[in-house]
Regions:
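N-terminal nucleotide/polyanion-binding subdomain common to many enzyme families
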Residues: 1-88
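Structural motif
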Residues: 36-38, 64, 104, 156-160, ...
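A short, gly/pro- and small-residue-rich
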Residues: 51-59, 167-188
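A transmembrane-helix-recognition feature enriched in membrane-embedded lipid enzymes
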Residues: 71-72, 195-246
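Short, flexible loop segments at boundaries between secondary-structure elements
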Residues: 134-138, 177-213
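Proline-aspartate-enriched helix->loop->beta-strand connector
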Residues: 149-163
Length: 246
């Protein structure tokens, strides 16, 4: 059984990038519905507060720690958990594909997914973009969107609807391929938003770069101190429980 690292209510297998890619490639070749979710601190906090959402994430075949906050929290539990951002993982999956992968892109505003698809096809020769659709559709159109996607027979479905909508959509529809929740990745690939410089990303400062790009994220940034406090309280509670059982 693979070792797991707990951060609040979530349990991660501490994969390296190579290990995560190997696991994902095996899921693709196995066929059928499989899910990759990429929780950051905000998503992990929501999971801790919402048991149903936590259970949803736990059903993923692959759970990757996207934010530096999750990896730092693991250290407070005395564990090492390599950070694997969703966008880096998706790009590596396309770059190292052992064969041509059929890819469908779902999310973003009108035109964003199409432009992102062109960019990905130009960068990754083994990425065959078989469909691209914006993410602004009502709940009653979900089945039609699902039918469009399944008709394209993708190996990979990048679902960029934002959390928790993207995870809930994947769980309700269960597309018969490897679905990856990727938040705002399409905006980056389409060229509408820039990623932080590599040095800043490696230093764990990508969240600050995003905040400077989009000051409206300040409301969401409030989840970071709340997450840190929740982790500290959880660690203290577990420590006190262990001492009490001695």
């Amino acid at each position: 059984m693979e070792r797991e690292v707990r951060v609040l209510s979530l349990h991660f297998t501490p994969y390296t990038m190579e290990g995560a890619l190997t696991r994902a490639q095996a899921l693709i070749e196995a066929g059928g519905c499989a899910r990759v979710y990429t929780p950051n601190a905000e998503i992990a906090l929501r999971a801790a507060r919402t048991p149903a959402f936590s259970d949803m994430l736990a059903r993923a075949e692959l759970l990757l720690p996207d934010g530096v906050g999750v990896s730092l929290a693991a250290r407070l539990y005395g564990e090492q958990l390599p950070r694997l951002t969703g966008i880096d993982f998706a790009e590596a999956l396309l770059a190292r594909a052992p064969r041509r992968y059929r890819v469908y892109l779902l999310g973003g505003k009108a035109g964003v997914a199409v432009r992102a698809g062109r960019a990905l096809a130009g960068r990754y020769p083994r990425a065959e973009i078989v469909g691209a659709r914006h993410g602004y559709f009502p709940r009653e159109e979900e089945r039609r969107v699902y039918d469009e996607i399944t008709a394209a027979r993708p190996d990979l479905l990048f679902v960029c609807l934002g959390s928790p909508r993207q995870e809930e959509w994947i769980e309700r529809l269960r597309p018969p391929c490897l679905s990856i929740g990727l938040g705002g990745a399409l905006d980056v690939w389409a060229g509408d938003k820039a990623r932080a410089p590599r040095a800043l990303r490696q230093a764990g400062g990508e969240w600050l770069f995003r905040l400077l790009q989009d000051p409206s994220r300040i409301v969401r940034a409030g989840a970071l101190p709340a997450f840190a406090l929740r982790v500290l309280l959880d660690r203290w509670h577990n420590h006190a429980k262990c001492r009490g059982s001695v």
